[in-house]
Structure formats: C-alpha cells, structure tokens
Regions:
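The feature captures the beta-strand-to-loop junction immediately N-terminal to the Walker
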Residues: 38-40
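Helix-to-loop junction immediately C-terminal to a conserved catalytic motif
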Residues: 53
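ABC ATPase NBD coupling module
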Residues: 69-83, 107, 112, 228-232
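Conserved ABC ATPase signature
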Residues: 136-141, 145
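Conserved catalytic motifs of ABC-family nucleotide-binding domains
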Residues: 158
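ABC ATPase "signature
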Residues: 222-223, 231
Length: 252
C-alpha cells in the first residue's frame, strides 16, 4: 500500500482542561482515497481538519502530512500544497471566477499563461465553460455554480491532499445530489487524498470509500459503508447509521 498522504497517530486535542475534543485519534488517508469523518456536532470532525493544515496544533500524538511531521514545513508552504473546499465555496467576492480558481497557482508564482490554461481546463472539468463563466463574479452564480468554482480552486495546483468541510451542505437537495455525482466523476481522474467532514451520512456513503464515526472525540469505527451497515462496532454506530441501511450509490 502506498504511504499515507495524511496520518494521525494517537492525537489528542483539548480547548479546556479535562474536556478533550479529540482523544487517541488515529487515522490514515492514502493517495486517491476519500475518507469521511461523521458524527454528532462537537465530536471533533472539524478540529481534525484544522490539525491537518496547522490551523491548530495537537496537544499529544503525531500528525504527518506528505510523509513528514506536520510541524516540519513552514505553515504557509504546507497550506499551499493542500486544497480546500468549504460551504458556498468560500470565494473572494470581488475576484472573477478565473481569478478565484487561480488563487494558489498565483501564490506559487505560476506564469500568467500557465494559470489561465489550468483555470480554463478545470472550469471545463466542473461543468462551467470558461467562455461563459471565467469573467463572472461570485454574486452572478448560483449556489451550485459557486460550489463548482470552489472545487476547481481546490484542485488548481494539483494538491496531493484535499480537505472538505461540509462542502455541499448549503445546496438544495437536487443541486447537492448533482454535484455529488459529479464529484465522484472528477475524483476518478485524480490521485489526491481527500478528507471529508459531513453531517450527512448519506453523503459520506456516496462519496467516501471509508468512513470514520466519531463520538465525543473518539473514533468508534472506521470502515466501508458496507462495514458500517452490516457490522457496526457498537450500539451507537448501529443507531447512527440505522436510517441509512437501505442501499445508496457509494464510492466503491
């Protein structure tokens, strides 16, 4: 098996004494793999994402990114090697669509023509023809279109790791299902590792090859969607996945 792109080993994180947000958190994400973090609010999902890009530092344990301790590279350099997709795309409102997609390549010093070619290719990939959308501004886009731009921006510098925090949570159900299907198609052509946080277990089942169920800062089970349905580790996992026992389209 290829070396993990992202690995947590026995990680602990607290914001107040005696109240761990993450405890003995151990998880690895391999190249080309999508792993979803699910669980109730406050279970530590977003904290794990922030540890991966050093918006937070662990109190104990180790976090490795790209085969080295996460504290080794300078934080800005680390973050430029990671793609991010968040709710509503997180676009810069006064930048055009193309300027938004070019954000990280611009920071990395790519020449203008290379940035343009990459941005236009990605806009085509996410279903936004550049001739129609490159010069638009975020306010001129629908929610689904903004989210597609957010995905294109995350992939612009071909990062080996993509972090997704509730990326499609603000979309209506029809738009959400459409972009989920498109994400699966895009993902097949990428080698990036993806760590996805979502409150929607059906979304995790559709998009992720493996799912980690968190509760009170601990991982209760890591497995495929089928593992969670058929072999839940305990009563909490069983109840958590109960409403999703009917087959759904999955990433596997």
């Amino acid at each position: 098996m290829a070396a993990a792109v992202l690995e947590f080993v026995g990680v602990g994180k607290s914001f107040a004494p005696g109240a761990p947000v993450l405890e003995d958190f151990t998880l690895a994400v391999s190249p080309g793999e999508t792993v979803a973090l699910v669980g109730p609010s406050g279970s530590g999902k977003t904290t794990a994402l922030k540890l991966a890009n050093r918006l937070l530092d662990a109190d104990s344990g180790e976090v490795h990114v790209f085969g080295e301790p996460v504290r080794a590279p300078e934080p800005a350099a680390l973050r430029r090697r990671i793609g991010y997709v968040i709710q509503e795309g997180g676009l810069f409102p006064h930048w055009s669509v193309r300027e938004n997609v070019e954000t990280v390549p611009r920071l990395l010093g790519w020449p203008d023509e290379k940035r343009r070619v990459r941005a236009e290719a990605l806009l085509e990939t996410v279903g936004l023809p550049p001739g129609e959308f490159s010069a638009r501004f975020p306010r001129e886009l629908s929610g689904g279109q903004r989210q597609r731009v957010g995905v294109a921006r995350a992939l612009a510098a071909d990062p080996p790791l993509v972090l997704m925090d509730e990326p499609f949570g603000a979309l209506d159900p029809i738009a959400r299902r459409a972009i989920q299907r498109e994400f699966l198609a895009w993902k097949r052509s990428l080698s990036a590792a993806v760590l996805l946080v979502t409150h929607d277990l059906s979304e995790a089942f559709r998009l992720a090859g493996r799912i980690a169920v968190l509760h009170r800062g601990r991982i209760l089970q890591v497995g495929t969607p089928d593992d969670l349905r058929r072999r839940p580790a305990d009563a909490f996992v069983r109840e958590f996945v109960q409403e999703f026992v009917e087959p759904v389209e999955t990433a596997t």
